[in-house]
């Protein structure tokens, strides 16, 4: 009896320890989903209220927009799974009809057609205008940035073009100067050539005009005629003068 009593008293202690281990494991398992929730990515689309209001407003159907049309618009514009969001969309439609934000033109519950009420339209306009202002500001800032970048690029291009033009003009000036120098050299060479030619022609002319120095003639001296003394010179014979009358009278 004593042995059985000891065995029965010991068994509950073991069971309690096992239950304590189970509790610890369940606590750890419960702690892990919290970390998963914290790491979950935020949704890439706005809340269902804004999406439904925007879809009804942009569809602009006279008889109201149906649930299918709203789903299609949300899936196309916001690129999300409209089937998963269907229960949230239905819930919002019912609450909006009850609050007076939406008007149900057809059907009952969430299966009919819906339109925005006047108060909802008034409320939606300032929100839309604020969004438009923000988008305009963003677009203006982006346009200014693009203008700045384009202006900087144009200034850089203009500077590069100006540098290229300057380099081209400098090269052209150098070429012109070289050509001028070559022409001047050619002119100088021509001048020097003409001067040399003139000098040579002048020398030739001077040499042609200079009288030639007569060379001494080496003629043999001819023997002079020697007049012999024996040959008497011919004397002029004087004719007798005519006797005058006085002489005749004697």
UniProtKB/Swiss-Prot annotation:
Cellular localization per UniProt: Nucleus; Chromosome
Residue spans of biased composition, Basic residues class: 235-250
Coarse class of the protein's main subcellular location: nucleus
Pfam families: Linker_histone
Record field: compositional bias (Basic and acidic residues): 120-133, 174-191
GO MF: double-stranded DNA binding; nucleosomal DNA binding; structural constituent of chromatin
GO cellular component: nucleosome; nucleus
Task performed by this protein: Histones H1 are necessary for the condensation of nucleosome chains into higher-order structures.
PANTHER family: H15 DOMAIN-CONTAINING PROTEIN-RELATED, HISTONE H1
UniProt-recorded name of the protein: Histone H1.3
Source species of the chain: Drosophila virilis (Fruit fly)
Organism lineage: Eukaryota, Metazoa, Ecdysozoa, Arthropoda, Hexapoda
């Amino acid at each position: 009896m004593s042995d059985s009593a000891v065995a029965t008293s010991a068994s509950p202690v073991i069971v309690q320890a096992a239950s304590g281990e189970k509790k610890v494991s369940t606590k750890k398992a419960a702690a892990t989903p919290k970390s998963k929730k914290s790491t979950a990515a935020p949704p890439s689309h706005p809340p269902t209220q804004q999406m439904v209001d925007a879809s009804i407003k942009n569809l602009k159907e006279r008889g109201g927009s149906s649930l299918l049309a709203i789903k299609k618009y949300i899936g196309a514009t916001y690129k999300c799974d409209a089937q998963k969001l269907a229960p949230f969309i239905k819930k919002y439609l019912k609450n909006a009809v009850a609050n007076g934000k939406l008007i149900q033109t057809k059907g009952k519950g969430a299966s009919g057609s819906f339109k925005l009420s006047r108060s909802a339209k008034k409320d939606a306009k300032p929100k839309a205008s604020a969004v438009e202002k923000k988008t305009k500001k963003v677009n203006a800032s982006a346009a200014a940035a693009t203008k700045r970048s384009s202006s900087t690029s144009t200034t850089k291009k203009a500077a590069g073009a100006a540098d290229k033009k300057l380099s081209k003009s400098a090269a052209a000036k150098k070429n012109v100067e070289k050509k001028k120098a070559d022409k001047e050299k050619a002119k100088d060479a021509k001048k020097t050539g003409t001067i040399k030619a003139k000098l040579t022609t002048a020398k030739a002319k001077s040499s042609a005009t200079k009288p030639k120095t007569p060379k001494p003639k080496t003629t043999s001296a001819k023997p002079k005629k020697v007049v012999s003394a024996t040959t008497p010179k011919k004397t002029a014979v004087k004719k007798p003068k005519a006797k005058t009358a006085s002489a005749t009278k004697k």
